[in-house]
Design a protein with these regions (language model features):
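A short, Lys/Arg-rich alpha-helix, primarily the initiator
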Residues: 2-26
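Short basic helix-loop element that most often maps to the first helix and adjoining turn
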Residues: 18-34, 62, 96
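Residue-level recognition of specific faces of alpha-helices
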Residues: 19, 44-47, 73
């Protein structure tokens, strides 16, 4: 299984969709084939790859097993996408994120 450390060294992914597309293309798979793994249609995989629609957390475990990659990396990108989508259009989004980061660091 490819570890989180190895995945970081592979490429610098910005989104889960980008990572999913790269993994699918590296394995010469069609979107519908990846969709079958997580029991969704190929159209949803297309939307995920284009960052138009998210997948559920439950899908990450299946994708991790199928592509033999660390589930933590998938969860990291999945959660980062969720956060980005919440704050991206907010005028104070980045400040709120930085504030939250500081608060979390102080709690631990």
């Amino acid at each position: 299984m490819e570890t989180l450390h190895k995945m970081k060294n592979r490429t610098n992914y910005q989104t889960l969709g980008e990572m999913l597309r790269q993994l699918r293309e590296e394995n010469n798979l069609m979107q519908r084939e990846v969709g079958a793994v997580i029991e969704v249609d190929g159209a949803l995989i297309s939307k995920v790859e284009n960052n138009e629609k998210p997948i559920n957390r439950e899908h990450l475990k299946k994708l991790s097993a199928f592509f033999e990659i660390d589930e933590d990396m998938l969860q990291l990108l999945w959660l980062a996408d969720k956060i980005r989508n919440i704050i991206k259009d907010e005028p104070l989004g980045l400040k709120a994120l930085n504030y939250t980061h500081t608060k979390l660091n102080n709690e631990h």
